[in-house]
Amino acid sequence: MVNSTKYEVAAQHEADDGSALGDGASPVAEQVKLKKEISLLNGVCLIVGNMIGSGIFVSPKGVLMYSASFGLSLVIWAVGGIFSVFGALCYAELGTTIKKSGASYAYILEAFGGFLAFIRLWTSLLIIEPTSQAVIAITFANYMVQPLFPSCGAPYAAGRLLAAACICLLTFINCAYVKWGTLVQDIFTYAKVLALIAVIIAGIVRLGQGATANFENSFEGSSFAMGDIALALYSALFSYSGWDTLNYVTEEIRNPERNLPLSIGISMPIVTIIYLLTNVAYYSVLDIKEILASDAVAVTFADQIFGVFNWIIPVAVAFSCFGGLNASIVAASRLLFVGSREGHLPDAICMVHVERFTPVPSLLFNGVLSLVYLCVEDIFQLINYYSFSYWFFVGLSIVGQLYLRWKDPDRPRPLKLSLFFPIIFCLCTIFLVAVPLYSDTINSLIGIGIALSGLPFYFFIIRVPEHKRPLFLRRIVASITRYLQILCMSVAAEMDLEDGELSKQDPKSK
């Protein structure tokens, strides 16, 4: 693992331990680091592209199922958007104050130290990132393959192979050049937004033609039971997840003090308005029974409205998944990169290609994890395990924001919010942590167990000083690192001291 001089290539290991990063390190390698190639437009597309996934096309019925009326469901969609704006604004302050990539991992590390940060990283490594990427890839594959089998279900193997090819292709694109990855993100974000605009325009035309029956007495039959409202809001917030995407790549943003909060400020209203108007469009054509009975609401909508052009929506869903998967790969690879740099993962993962300046090892590691999870037949079941963990660590990040306000009040903060925003958000995340514990207790407890399974690794590996680890183990790790350097043409990266902050102490000591 990385020691206290982890940002200097030649000092990571002693040569007599068989290190791959010993005396032979080139002086030039010390200058290799991730470049600032993400513009304001790229940032907006990353956030919008990750937030707008397949959910708004396929299953927006979760909110309607629990709210039981069109009127209340639209209110809950709006509340979910406002809540997400609060969270995104808090992350904008954190991202401009702690200018490290890694999002909540970096913020928890700064506020509370290495232990909680490692558990956050462990949960992402084991469940959150590979599971979500595998599910997105499978959804993409299903929408691409199913039209070839109109009268029966698509073969299982065909879907999984196409999903694997999708993960491999996007991993290669992001390994090649950062610009290629951002270009893919921009193009597919435009495509999915245009598809939703087409749905919205069709809905507006229908309303203009007098199709307003579903909006008369729109609150009739509403379920105001706290349990139902809680589950409806939870469904809406799941669709809004992804607003923290840009915080995973803070160190690669041009002028982050300006572009990070501005990207968030532009993206959040766009997504909220699109979600609201898309649901209005659905409600103008489909009644409650049709929506709840549909496996893919947008496809059912297109069958009734677009006629021979109804193929547009399945293609749009596939495009949406492709763009969302690309954003997820970018974010997850940076999380692994930062985790390695902070000493919580093997050194090899925080290396950067010497010519292309891309984090090739972390991208490959992330890709391999996702491919492994594709082999899990009931992969969708794994999603149920991480709802509790996800919101717990998001809330803990905002608690860290409040703690740093108290602990370090004089710290430079380019963006400083009123305490109203983080306090309200913290109170709401308590609710979001409690909901799955109440409604899905078994799966939530399994998720907690998965997070706690990282304890032995932390106390028996991470916290053990490197010189006390078995020599054979150090040599094995050094050999793997050496071969990865050769294979990936990569060297350990320096942190950008101009925009980042060196750890004041080793996270392993906390």
Swiss-Prot record:
Catalysed conversion reaction: L-leucine(out) + L-arginine(in) + Na(+)(out) = L-leucine(in) + L-arginine(out) + Na(+)(in); L-leucine(out) + L-lysine(in) + Na(+)(out) = L-leucine(in) + L-lysine(out) + Na(+)(in); L-leucine(out) + L-ornithine(in) + Na(+)(out) = L-leucine(in) + L-ornithine(out) + Na(+)(in)
Keyword Membrane belongs to the record: yes
GO BP term, example: L-leucine transport
Glycosylation sites: N3, N326
Pfam families associated with the record: AA_permease_2 (PF13520)
Keyword set, alphabetical order: Amino-acid transport, Cell membrane, Disulfide bond, Glycoprotein, Membrane, Phosphoprotein, Transmembrane, Transmembrane helix, Transport
Assembly information from the UniProt record: Disulfide-linked heterodimer with the amino acid transport protein SLC3A2/4F2hc.
Protein name per Swiss-Prot or TrEMBL: Y+L amino acid transporter 1
Organism: Mus musculus (Mouse)
Phylogenetic placement of the source organism: Eukaryota, Metazoa, Chordata, Craniata, Vertebrata
